[in-house]
């Protein structure tokens, strides 16, 4: 993978709920998850801020809260990210891509806190209700931002774009499309394992 693969940090309100959902979305997009921060992860605020600052992820995915639920913990996580002023591993002149996929009621506050400090993109909630995950919109945004922001900083990428006769897509997305095409053509149910 270019530059060692997409390295992401994810956040959630409850570690074993929205934190894990955010992690699944990132992993499903082919990312390497370097840390999962959550309101209940046992770390003090200054420890969370320092961790964000030192990890230098390529991208951050923020999740948390069900739609219509409380917003205070989601806003708190946004404030930690803002206080850390995270810088990307590559391309120090650009803003860090950040995807917000949490409680839609917190969107205005998250935009106010992080809109100027990051390349913020808002998408559908990863867990709109407790009983259901909605990972695809966040996964698709990860792919889009990876190509738009992260890969633009990779050496040789612009030349590759000039040489390619078709749009470039992240490897996990390409593999997924190949598997879907094979399954459809052969009338099979497939499962893929990326090792």
Placement of each model-derived feature along the sequence:
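Short glycine-aspartate micro-motif
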Residues: 190-194
């Amino acid at each position: 993978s270019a530059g060692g693969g997409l390295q992401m940090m994810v956040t959630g309100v409850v570690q074993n709920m929205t934190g894990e959902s955010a992690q699944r979305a990132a992993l499903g997009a082919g990312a390497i998850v370097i840390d999962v921060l959550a309101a209940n992860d046992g770390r003090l605020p200054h420890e969370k801020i320092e961790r964000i600052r030192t990890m230098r992820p390529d991208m951050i995915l923020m999740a948390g809260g069900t739609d219509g639920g409380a917003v205070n913990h989601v806003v708190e996580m946004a404030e930690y990210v803002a206080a850390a002023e995270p810088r990307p591993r590559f391309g120090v002149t650009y803003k860090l891509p950040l995807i917000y996929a949490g409680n839609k009621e917190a969107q205005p506050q998250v935009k106010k806190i992080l809109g100027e400090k990051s390349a913020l993109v808002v998408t559908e909630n990863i867990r709109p209700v407790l009983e259901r995950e909605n990972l695809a919109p966040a996964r698709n945004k990860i792919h889009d931002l990876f190509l738009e922001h992260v890969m633009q900083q990779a050496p040789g990428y612009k030349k590759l774009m000039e040489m390619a006769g078709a749009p470039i897509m992240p490897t996990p997305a390409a593999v997924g499309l190949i598997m879907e095409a094979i399954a459809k053509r052969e009338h099979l149910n497939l499962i893929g394992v990326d090792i």
